[in-house]
Amino acid sequence: MRLLGPLQVRRADGSLIHPREWRTGKTVDLLRLLATRSGEAVSVDEILEALWPNVDEHRGRGSLRNALGQLRKLLGQTAIERQRDGLVLRDAWVDTAALLKLADEARRHARHGRLALAVNVAREAEALHLGEFRAHDPDALWAVPIRENLEARFREMVLDAAEYAVELGWMRDALELGHRALDADTTSERAYRVLMSGFAGLGETERALRTYERCRAVLAEELGIDPSAQSRSLHLEILTSEHHEPPVAPFTGRDRELSTLLTWCAQRRATGTPGVVYLSGPDGSGRTRLVHEAARSLGAEVEVVE
């Protein structure tokens, strides 16, 4: 069940529910409300207050029964169960819950110094965030705190991951995450600093400096303030160097892959048999760094062929 961006709901058999199958917007919003609390009961009183706030209780309960019947018809009779005086959505994968779980996971990795894993988890979460959480009724007050919490958690995770990517020297990841963070908040100095560091780290000094000028202009126009001392310091650092390249960070988060690669190389060396190993992954995932770390451990040199 995807609630972020356009609604997508699949039945247990994998078939997609077509938008025309939803009878009313209230039916869809009932599902959205239950899905955001997947596995937890939502009281009938809370549902009535959220979806039928200006309707007397008798009519509201009748509308709820109709919407519930429609949902069970579409999803299956056991998909939504009564629990005391509430309703609970059972056995459903929901993107909002998955996103919050990934945000918690990324935070745990970072807390224990596993920055590479934190970045990878954030990139996984990016694929889930296809848009904001919205109710069918654009004025629905119940959806506001849910949307604000999801967006705040996502922005924080992406910004943190962007900064970790800079520390790791994963500049292309840093740029992609920084742009994503800036799309969510055009006044985020943290995002601008990530982009400045990313461009400078790739030797694109002019783009780094232009990013600072854009930051300065946006802050002045939108907030009436100047860039912070931290942003000004980074700007000066880039100005006074040919290109900004942070020190090489410790190699973390790839211990298992490095061990596997070294074991494979040792076996080839012991038997005297040549071989080829392929490392697959998206740009900026750390493949080149992994090869260099393996070569350093083996006392070998790496030749890059474009």
Which residue stretches match the model-derived regions?
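A short acidic, leucine-rich amphipathic alpha-helix
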Residues: E46-L48
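P-loop NTPase Walker A phosphate-binding motif
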Residues: P282-E306
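Gly/Thr-rich phosphate-binding loop signature of adenosyl cofactor/nucleotide-binding cores
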Residues: V9, L31
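Phosphate-binding P-loop
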Residues: A266-P274
